[in-house]
UniProtKB/Swiss-Prot annotation:
Enzyme Commission (EC) number: 1.-.-.-
Family: Belongs to the oxygen-dependent FAD-linked oxidoreductase family.
Example of a GO MF term: oxidoreductase activity
Official protein name in the record: FAD-linked oxidoreductase easE
Function (record text): FAD binding oxidoreductase; part of the gene cluster that mediates the biosynthesis of fumiclavanine C, a fungal ergot alkaloid. DmaW catalyzes the first step of ergot alkaloid biosynthesis by condensing dimethylallyl diphosphate (DMAP) and tryptophan to form 4-dimethylallyl-L-tryptophan. The second step is catalyzed by the methyltransferase easF that methylates 4-dimethylallyl-L-tryptophan in the presence of S-adenosyl-L-methionine, resulting in the formation of 4-dimethylallyl-L-abrine.
PROSITE patterns for this protein: FAD_PCMH
Residues carrying covalently attached carbohydrate according to the record: 343, 382, 487
GO BP term, example: fumigaclavine C biosynthetic process
Induction of expression: The expression of the ergot alkaloid synthesis cluster which leads to the synthesis of fumigaclavines is positively regulated by the brlA and stuA transcription factors.
Length: 628
């Protein structure tokens, strides 16, 4: 109850300022300097006044559409002294105003609470200052706003998103789009911003035989999901009804947001049925103008192409995505692991090289797998390989696979473990629950593709093992692969494979992902971890294959200096043209996204000179010729 009273008091105090304001500086939202065109920063430096105006305007013009404005605060703000504002508590309010603000503040508390499986504190703090507090920080610690958006519109329908988008466009607000906030590069947060939160849009609709708008071709069974549906919710529905989709390993990730629009990789299913974007049949999108459009091969094909790999929060807000479903068939899973001292050369030249050789051999037989490397201590590491024989529950074949694996590993003289099980459904092999992580645990990530040419070469497995032998990893770090090749690279010329992903994806055998832990919740530790990831670990990952520099944007280096080329390559030129067509004023902004080079680092100022953008455009044109 005390939290609610404090929250109401905060919101109520903010409204007092309304009486002293005739009109906020909405009509003059842009200021000019020698180097940039910026949002009106003075507006954001008095958030209590702006909050009052926003609540009033939402109450008067938006509440009739059911849009609720929420005040978003740090995870630990309810337990600590907030530095967001220093407002007086003397005022008078009507009962209806109190009711509105109680609802608003309760929403804000719920949306800001951290969860053990969402290590998001890294992108609440600033790059150089500890600007927010955490649930387990000292009780007397001050709480600041950090990179948490100031306000959030918790939407439940498409028309509510339209209202919120037009509101942001009209008042030139720095806009952030969020579903689960499951992002390791801070794309769903932003200082001094206005957030559209789509997590309540939970519609799931199955189609026996989907036909896209404007088409007379039946595309087979499919499922349409709302912007707030998670992979776990979709997996559960599919397990009940007998189908699966290509999705990631973490069930708390959103199904239609950044995961899908950034490409969508499965550790094993992509090898069989392609990337998630290869399976998209249609999007429903709210554009920067607030219009609703349907995008598929027949309607608005340009933005349909861009949304299949160009990244979330960039071209519009996807309110519904329709994708192919696949039979929830049986699968046999084989698991093998080796471990030993990190300085034991045999572990790398025989054990881990052996695992990569096994993976290569099984890939050539049409069986995908995932390699995982994790430290057990400062001196010991564990390497494991999980293989998925899909569309079979033949225990005899599984036993034969195990025997071939055993023969390879016994020749290494290293200790190993081996196990196998057959499951009636693929969905039984998918994770049901989220990661439960230590208190204040945060992560950042990096990734790189490995080409089929390298992986399938005679020296490929040994080369990978030797590259990883000296790869620096902390006690909570993790390195894992996602199996590409197969149907990711097959039939490249087919229309449904024409996505905006970097063309290198169609030439890759595996994606290597590195998860770098940030265990101490301070801006200093965050900055140190980011710099080490960028300057040390990512450099070593790119050195695996210097002439094949392609990365996965969804798990990319937050400090990536060549984003346009490593994420999109020759496709960037066309993506930028589509961005300018559908969002000419850059209402939608995504960190290291298409067009982001035109903005300053804090995302509040737009550079007057587009030299950097022109350079990226030129590099993309050159790359187009190389990949032809």
């Amino acid at each position: 109850m005390s939290h609610r009273i404090l929250c109401v008091a905060f919101c109520v105090c903010s409204l007092v300022a309304v009486s002293s304001i005739y009109s906020p500086p909405f009509n003059h939202p842009i200021v000019y300097s020698n180097n940039a065109i910026c949002f009106q920063l003075s507006t954001w430096r008095i958030p209590q006044l702006y909050l009052a105006v926003l609540i009033r305007r939402f109450d008067l013009s938006l509440s009739t559409r059911g849009v609720m404005l929420a005040v978003t605060v740090g995870v630990g703000s309810s337990q600590h002294h907030s530095q967001r504002s220093g407002l007086s508590l003397t005022f008078a309010m009507t009962p209806s105003m109190i009711t509105l603000l109680v609802k608003t503040c309760v929403i804000s508390q719920r949306t800001a609470v951290g969860e053990p499986h969402r290590p998001g504190w890294v992108w609440e703090v600033g790059r150089t200052e500890d600007e927010t507090c955490h649930a387990h920080s000292p009780r007397g610690a001050p709480c600041h706003q950090g990179r948490i958006p100031l306000y959030s519109a918790a939407v439940e329908s498409v028309d509510q998103i339209q209202v919120a988008v037009r509101f942001a466009q009209r008042h030139r607000l720095r806009l952030v789009v969020r579903n689960t906030g499951h992002d390791t590069a801070g794309r769903s947060s932003g200082s001094d911003s206005f957030q559209i939160h789509c997590h309540r849009m939970k519609q799931i609709e199955y189609h026996d035989n989907f036909r896209a708008l404007g088409s007379d071709i039946d595309r087979g069974p499919a499922v349409s999901v709302g912007a707030g549906v998670t992979l776990g919710e979709m997996y559960a529905r599919g397990a009940r009804d007998g189908w699966v989709v290509v999705g990631g390993e973490c069930p708390t990730v959103g199904a239609a947001g950044g995961f899908l629009q950034g490409g969508g990789v499965s550790s094993f299913h992509s090898f069989i049925d392609g990337l998630a974007v290869d399976n998209v049949l249609e999007f429903e999108v709210v554009t920067a103008k607030g219009d609703v459009v349907v995008a598929n091969d027949h309607q608005n094909p340009d933005i349909f192409w861009a949304l299949r790999g160009g990244g979330g929060g960039t071209f519009g807000i996807v309110t519904r995505a329709t994708m192919r479903v696949h039979l929830n068939s049986p699968v046999c899973v084989s698991e093998v692991a080796v471990s030993g001292l990190r300085n034991n050369s045999l572990l790398w030249t025989k054990g881990i090289t052996g695992l990569f050789s096994i993976l290569r051999s099984f890939n050539q037989q049409g069986i995908p797998g995932q390699f995982i490397l994790r430290p057990l201590s400062k001196d010991q590491v564990n390497a494991s390989l999980t293989l998925y024989s899909l569309n079979t529950d033949d225990t005899r074949r599984s036993a034969e696979n195990m025997l071939s694996i055993r023969n390879i590993l016994e020749s290494t003289t290293l200790p190993f473990t081996l196990a196998s099980r057959c499951l009636p459904k693929i969905s039984d092999a998918l994770r049901k629950g989220p990661d439960m992580l230590p208190v204040n645990y945060g992560i950042i990530t990096g990734s790189v593709l490995v080409s089929e040419d390298l992986f399938n070469s005679e020296e490929g497995p040994l080369h990978l093992a030797k590259q990883l032998e000296h790869f620096p990893m902390g006690p909570m770090d993790l390195l894992f692969t996602s199996n590409l090749g197969g149907n990711v690279s097959a039939n490249t010329g087919k229309k449904h494979r024409d996505t905006s992903m970097h063309p290198g994806w169609r030439q890759a055998a595996h994606l290597i992902n590195f998860v770098r832990s940030v265990s101490t919740p301070t801006a200093h530790e965050k900055a140190r971890s980011l710099e080490e990831l960028h300057s040390v670990q990512m450099r070593q990952l790119y050195d695996i294959e210097p002439d094949f520099r392609v990365s996965y944007r969804n798990l990319g280096d937050p400090l990536e200096s060549d984003a346009a080329q490593v994420y999109w390559g020759p496709n960037y030129k066309r993506l930028l043209e589509i961005k300018r067509k559908w969002d000419p004023e850059d209402l939608f902004f995504s960190q290291l996204g298409v067009g982001s080079e035109g903005w300053t680092e804090d995302q509040m100022c737009k550079r007057q000179q587009r030299l950097q953008q022109m350079l990226q455009y030129l590099m993309s044109s050159i790359a187009q010729r190389v990949y032809r």
